[in-house]
């Protein structure tokens, strides 16, 4: 059955835009995104150590190869997620993401070789690209234009708090029971619950998009996906600034995911304390987005993005230059603070600059570039670490992060999140 175009008016007069008006579906989507985040969290502490300790991999580049497969596949899944969301509906894409993610924890538990881990992460990339994208897009659909920063902040809070909590729990469980299989059991629970809730309780939000489009005073011009890709990637200065900042943000996150556990372990830190450091960064990032998302609605996006990128850079420099747990903890806190300022502001900035009828596709292009940063960050950090050492890899990517913030300062135009 063909779907009505997104610009068409909805016939359901009971529909309203707003967080209060849609709080039940919004709350369910927050819970589901916590499960999506938890799927990544099971890997943050233990998977790099599985590569080095169980499979005896000595090359940093090879150890981080699982992040490269994850990042490339997730970026491509992001790219098609907006198209699929407009054609099939948001709920169907969300459910598909969970069905693809169900085998991932079992593959990690039973993996007889590193190739299985890489394959599991390709499936995880599809899961994250489809499921996380839909939770973001559906929340933005529900709340309308005035609370985008709040919606994104709450979404990312749930996801990255779950990443942090799960990274801590897997580190703790690994210190007690080994790297496999016990820590990975968490992922089985996340995948089953996420799939069941998505299938049984979530409703599609395309009628909310039609409602917003019908209320807009702007005349929407139909655009092809190629036009949206070029506009989001290069042509629109705000969308370009957001896309490059998103790429660099996840570039340094991919680097930290892959080589921080190896860096800390090289100085004799145990897996439980590594788990603490790996938890502090995403947990700080997740919790503070409750504040930074709404602040971007009030203050505008640009300032938070610029300062946030510079704070991330400072956190990376502190981590690279020091050799003590306490200083690494400070570096992780700075990374979390900076990312909390940047992450919801970037998604809200892209939503601000996009028409409701092609917003999902523009967000999918932004998320393509952003999550391609995982692969670029892990691969470049692995190569630099093999050639010059891990500290050099962290420092060089810290400098690149500072440069990205400077580009946003020069290119992006200031805009309040409350502007239509």
Task: Report each predicted region and the residues it spans.
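Helix-to-loop junctions at the C-terminal end of transmembrane segments
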Residues: 77-89, 174, 288-300, 385
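Symmetry-related core transmembrane helices of the 12-TM Major Facilitator Superfamily/SLC fold
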Residues: 182-199, 394-410
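Helix-loop boundary and gating motifs at the non-cytosolic
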Residues: 20-71, 238-245, 249-267
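Juxtamembrane intracellular "pre-TM" segments in multi-pass secondary transporters
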Residues: 3-23, 207-242
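Residue-level signature of mid-helix packing/kink "hotspots" within the transmembrane helices
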Residues: 71-79, 164, 282-290, 374-375
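Cytoplasmic helix-loop-helix junction between adjacent transmembrane helices
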Residues: 120-160, 348-349
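C-terminal ends and interior cores of transmembrane alpha-helices
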Residues: 99-112, 311-323
